A protein has these predicted regions:
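Glycine-rich loops and low-complexity Gly/Arg-rich segments
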Residues: 23-26, 48-51, 88-93, 146-150, ...
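An amphipathic, basic-hydrophobic helix/alpha-beta surface used to engage anionic
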Residues: 1-74, 78, 110, 120-123, ...
């Protein structure tokens, strides 16, 4: 016994090696190309995703990304390492989606189908969707820890009083 030999208590502290998988589901639809205060919603989502990604590598976790609109635009499988994170951030900054619409159901169903082991999934979106995604989210939440982060601009809810104006749906 170490305590008996050295005549003082010996405490060994174990640090858990978690190696979680973190998935970022990033909405790249046209509704994120809006911003009035300091930045576009797309830039805000990218900044949040980059912060989460760097936090994941600090914990030695794997990080993966699903870019989605009304379809899966791109999937980057979870991996570890700084090089992988920099690749993900470069993709986030340069990504050009094929569609402007949003289907959150498709993204969550893809997550449950592709990621086999339990993970922590962050959904970054403005959640301007036409379909109800609550049932699919509950199914995904049985297997994964799903966290929704809403990217929001206050002007999206309050239109300025400027009279008649032309509005185009993305």
């Amino acid at each position: 016994n170490v305590t008996a030999r050295f005549h003082h208590p010996f405490v060994k502290v174990f640090e858990e090696e978690r190696e979680l998988t973190v998935m970022l589901l990033i909405d790249v639809s046209g509704s994120l190309d809006f911003g009035t205060t300091h930045q576009m919603k797309r830039d805000m989502a990218t900044e949040i995703a980059a912060t989460l990604a760097f936090s994941a590598i600090q914990n030695n976790d794997k990080i993966g990304v699903i870019f989605f609109s009304d379809r899966i635009e791109q999937y980057i499988a979870p991996k570890k390492g700084r090089k992988h994170i920099l690749y993900i951030i470069r993709e986030m900054l340069d990504f050009k989606p094929e569609s402007k619409k949003t289907d959150l159901n498709a993204a969550i169903e893809f997550l449950t189908r592709v990621v086999k082991h339990p993970c922590t999934a962050f959904v970054l979106s403005d959640f301007y969707v036409r379909s109800d995604f609550q049932q699919v989210l509950q199914i995904a939440n049985r297997k994964h820890d799903v966290i929704a982060l809403q990217v929001y601009d206050p002007r999206a809810k309050e239109l300025p009083d400027v009279g008649l104006m032309n509005v185009t749906d993305a």
